[in-house]
Regions:
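H/E-rich (His + Asp/Glu) clusters that bind or coordinate divalent metals
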Residues: 203-210, 217, 222-223
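Active-site beta-loop-alpha junctions enriched in small/polar residues
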Residues: 7-11, 34-38, 67-72, 98-101, ...
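Active-site acidic/histidine proton-transfer and metal-coordination neighborhood
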Residues: 17-18, 56-63, 71-154, 163
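Acidic/histidine-rich catalytic cores of soluble enzymes
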Residues: 4, 116-204
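Well-formed, non-transmembrane alpha-helical positions, independent of function
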Residues: 22, 85, 143, 173-177, ...
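Substrate-binding clefts and catalytic carboxylate motifs of secreted carbohydrate-active enzymes
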Residues: 233
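N-terminal pre-domain/capping segments
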Residues: 1-93, 123, 180, 241-251
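Charged helix-capping and loop-helix junction motifs
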Residues: 45-52, 77-82, 106-112, 138-142, ...
Length: 251
């Protein structure tokens, strides 16, 4: 019922095994990665390196829930190179960014091709709302998903809506057509007026309401923990995750 996924920062855990060890310490079965690990693009890694990584995933009992692709989605050769190694590692989803496009429709055309490539490997393609991007509001996300077609899922990041002084639950989620399309809920909270992050439940991002309604709708995605404060220590991460789990217990 509760899938906890963490994206360990390079500041806290620079190496792949260190990231898996951090997952162990905080009790998360799912790990999120960038497509660049210790300076090397995942799609460029050789078979021996990928096999070693796969062995570590088995040893630690972890699953890669998400890989963030940092390249351009129009570069399908690079994207497909990432897909091949991601598939071998058992990754469940890849997130792409839609920067560099003038319209959502233009981004959707390239995203659609990436989504079909990913589908061939049994991998979901994900997009995430970001307050400083083309996909700032829920209607932008809806348009991209509708235009790009199947195998495109969303990552709902409430703090980005809070930074725009929009209520993530009442303004963005409640009337959304993407309620059943959410693959990840970012566990993030922040304050409208100061535009700064806060612990879950202490800001205006309505994280408790979002988690509650998703669970009531049989949410099968991941609650995703990220270093949204910036350079969080191990103690900070513990406090952050504990705060959210406390909210869950209060529901």
């Amino acid at each position: 019922m509760y899938k906890f996924s963490i994206a360990p920062s390079d500041y806290l855990a620079p190496g792949f095994e260190q990231k898996l060890a951090l997952c162990d310490r905080v009790g998360c079965a799912y790990v999120e990665l960038s497509d660049v690990l210790e300076g090397t693009f995942l799609g460029d890694m050789d078979g021996n390196t990928i096999e070693t990584m796969r062995g570590l995933l088995i040893d630690y009992g972890k699953t890669i829930s998400l890989i963030t692709y940092t390249g351009k989605i129009a570069d399908r050769e690079r994207f497909c190179a990432l897909l091949r190694n991601a598939h071998f590692l058992g990754a469940k989803a890849i997130k792409v960014c839609c920067d560099g496009y003038d319209t959502v429709e233009a981004a959707a055309a390239d995203a659609s091709e990436c989504a079909q490539d990913a589908k061939c490997y049994g991998i979901r393609l994900c997009v995430e709302n970001r307050h400083d991007s083309l996909l700032a509001r829920n209607q932008d996300m809806e348009l991209l998903v509708k235009t790009a077609g199947d195998n495109v899922y969303t990552i709902f990041n409430p703090i980005c809506y809070a930074y725009m002084r929009a209520h993530p639950f009442f303004h963005e989620f409640y009337g959304s057509k993407l309620k059943n399309n959410i693959a990840f809920l970012r566990v993030s909270d922040g304050l409208f007026c100061e535009r700064r992050p806060s612990l879950p439940g202490q800001g205006n991002a309505e994280i408790k309401e979002l988690a509650s309604i998703l669970l009531s709708r049989s949410f099968d995605g991941c609650f995703s923990f990220t270093d949204y404060f910036g350079q969080m220590s191990w103690e900070d991460m513990q406090e952050y995750i504990t705060a959210f789990k406390t909210l869950l217990k209060q529901m």
